Regions:
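Acidic, glycine-rich calcium-binding repeat modules characteristic of RTX/beta-roll
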Residues: 1-356
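Low-complexity acidic/polar repeat-biased segments
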Residues: 362-400
Length: 400
C-alpha cells in the first residue's frame, strides 16, 4: 500500500473574480492501493465574486482498496457573491475504496449572496462497495445565500452496496433570508443495497428572520430506492431569535421512499419554530403493498406549533412542557401509507407534564369540530390527532 505525504497548503483569494482549486494530494495515483496523506488546507476568501474548490485528496476516482486521507479543510469566506465547495476526498468512489475521516469548516457567515457547500467524501457518486469516512462538517450561511448543500458523504448518489460513514454535521443559518439543505449521507438518492450511516445533524436557524429555513434529511435529500437502508440518525433544529415562524423540514430518511427500501430508527428534535417532521418520508411508492418498512422513530417537536408524521412501524411522539399546539397526522396510521395492514402501536409520551394517571389525562381529551381528538395538555399546549376520535384512545396509547 502506497502512502502519500502529509501536506499543508494556505491559499488567499483577495482579488475580484479569482478562481482557485486546491488539492491535498495533487496527482493522486490512478492505482488500486493508495492512501492519501493527512493534509491541511486553509483558504481565505476576501475578494468578491470568487470561486473556490477544495479537495482533500484529488479530483479523481478513488478505486480498488485506495483510501482518502484524514484531512482538515477550512474555507473562510469573507467577501460577497462568492461560491465555494469543499470535498473531503475525491470526485467519486468505487470498488472497496474508503473515504478518510475528515474535518471540514465552511464558514460564509459574514458574507452576502454567497453559496457554500461541503461533502464529506465525494462531490459526485459512491458506488460498488465504497465506504464513506466518519466526517465532521461545520458550516455557516449568511444573508441571501444560494443553494447551500451539505452532505456527510456524497454530493450525488450512493449506489450498489456503498455505505455512508457515521458523520456529524452542524450548520448555522446566521442571518435573514438564508437556507440550508443538510443530508447525513447523500444529496441524491440511495439506490440498490446502499446503506446510510448513523449520522448526527444539527441546524441552527436565526430566529431574527421569519424566512430563515433549513431542511434536514437523515440519509438522502432525494429518495431511498430499491432495497436501500436508512441509518439510525439524530436530527436537531435549534432556533436563535424571536420569530416562531422560522422553521424546518425534517426527514428521518428521505422525502420519498420507493420499492423495498427500509427506514432507519431515527430521532427528530424540533426547535422553537414551526417544524414539519417526518419519521421516515413524506411520499411512499412501494413495489408491492407493504414492501416499504418504516423505522421505529422518536419525534419531539420542541416548542412551536409542529406537524408530525411518524411513518410506518411503531413510533414515539414526545411532548415536554411548552410544546405548543402540535398535530400528529398519522397516529397509528403510518403503515397505511405503504399499503400495509400490519398493526402498529404508536405511543404518545407526556411524562413531562406530570399527569398522575390515565384518569387525570383522559379528562383533558375531547373531539374538536372536525371530529379529531385534541389532548389539552395545558392552557397553551395541545396535541391534535388527525382522523382519531377521543373514544378511540386508551391508556396503552400513552406514556404517562
Amino acid at each position: 500500500m502506497q502512502h502519500l505525504p502529509n501536506d499543508t497548503y494556505d491559499v488567499t483569494l483577495d482579488q475580484f473574480g479569482q478562481i482557485a482549486t486546491v488539492y491535498g494530494d495533487p496527482g493522486f495515483p490512478v492505482a488500486t492501493d493508495v492512501v492519501g496523506g493527512n493534509d491541511t488546507v486553509t483558504a481565505a476568501v476576501a475578494g468578491l465574486n470568487a470561486k473556490l474548490t477544495i479537495f482533500g485528496d484529488d479530483h479523481a476516482m478513488l478505486l480498488g482498496h485506495s483510501q482518502g486521507g484524514n484531512d482538515t479543510l477550512i474555507a473562510d469566506i469573507d467577501g460577497g457573491w462568492d461560491t465555494a465547495i469543499v470535498i473531503g476526498d475525491t470526485q467519486s468512489m468505487i470498488d472497496d475504496s474508503k473515504g478518510g475521516n475528515d474535518t471540514i469548516v465552511a464558514d460564509a457567515g459574514r458574507t452576502v449572496y454567497t453559496t457554500i457547500s461541503a461533502f464529506g467524501d465525494v462531490a459526485a457518486d459512491m458506488s460498488g462497495n465504497a465506504q464513506g469516512g466518519h466526517d465532521d462538517i461545520t458550516g455557516s450561511i449568511a444573508w441571501r445565500g444560494g443553494a447551500n448543500l451539505f452532505a456527510g458523504d456524497a454530493g450525488g448518489f450512493m449506489m450498489d452496496t456503498s455505505h455512508g460513514g457515521n458523520d456529524t454535521l452542524d450548520v448555522s443559518v446566521l442571518t435573514t433570508d438564508g437556507a440550508a439543505t443538510v443530508s447525513g449521507d447523500a444529496i441524491g438518492s440511495l439506490r440498490g443495497l446502499a446503506h446510510g450511516g448513523n449520522d448526527n445533524l444539527t441546524v441552527t436557524l436565526n430566529g431574527g428572520s421569519a424566512i430563515s429555513s433549513g431542511a434536514l434529511f437523515g440519509d438522502s435529500a432525494a429518495s431511498l430506492m430499491d432495497f436501500a437502508q436508512g441509518g439510525d440518525d439524530v436530527l436537531t433544529v435549534k432556533l436563535d431569535g424571536q420569530y416562531a415562524e422560522a422553521g424546518a423540514q425534517m426527514y428521518g430518511d428521505a422525502p420519498t421512499m420507493v420499492g423495498n427500501s427500509h427506514g432507519g430508527n431515527d430521532v427528530l428534535n424540533g426547535g422553537a419554530g414551526r417544524d414539519f417532521m417526518y419519521g421516515d418520508a413524506r411520499i411512499y411508492e412501494p413495489a408491492t403493498p407493504g414492501s416499504i418498512t418504516g423505522g421505529v422513530d422518536t419525534l419531539n417537536g420542541g416548542a412551536g406549533d409542529d406537524r408530525m408524521w411518524g411513518g410506518g412501524s411503531s413510533d414515539f411522539f414526545v411532548f415536554n412542557t411548552g410544546s405548543g399546539n402540535d398535530t400528529i397526522v398519522d397516529f397509528d396510521q403510518g403503515n397505511k401509507a405503504v399499503g400495509s395492514t400490519a398493526v402498529e402501536q404508536d405511543l404518545i409520551d407526556v411524562q413531562g407534564y406530570g399527569f398522575a394517571d390515565w384518569t387525570a389525562l383522559s379528562k383533558l381529551i375531547s373531539d374538536n369540530t372536525a371530529g379529531d381528538a385534541v389532548i389539552h395538555l395545558s392552557a397553551n399546549d395541545s396535541i391534535t390527532l388527525d382522523g382519531i376520535h377521543a373514544t378511540n384512545l386508551h391508556p396503552t396509547d400513552f406514556i404517562i
